[in-house]
Amino acid sequence: MVGSALGRQGDRPVGPDGPGGPDHGWFRQGTIDLRKFERYLFDPDHPQNEGKAEGWRKVFDLGPGDALAAERLIREQIDQAEIVEQEPKGRYRRWELLIPDCVGPNGNVAPLLTAWALDPDNKLPHLSTSFPRPP
């Protein structure tokens, strides 16, 4: 495993209660449920999609059947992002990581927002949503 951009704790990822808070490695190891892409982020008919599917298609030319490519894109480029903790929602701690210059498989470059949540019963976060912002 590659260490964080800050190099804290060597090659071990640092979680939210470590010195300085979570590092990129902790998010890189987090859970990304591929069904979230297929059933929500890439589905324009999902009632809560709010244009996310159109953004993925227009910016990175990704859509149904491309969940693995989207996961790879996030995991490989998450180190560019600033880690910003958000207000907790219910029992979940939350973070936003904006990848400022995400390069899609089609070569397009655009900011990509990733949002993560941590269930207190788990050790790693899960991706809650993600969508590109127009360049």
Predicted regions and their residues:
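Short, compact, well-ordered microdomains
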Residues: E87-P135
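Compact soluble domain cores
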Residues: M1-P100
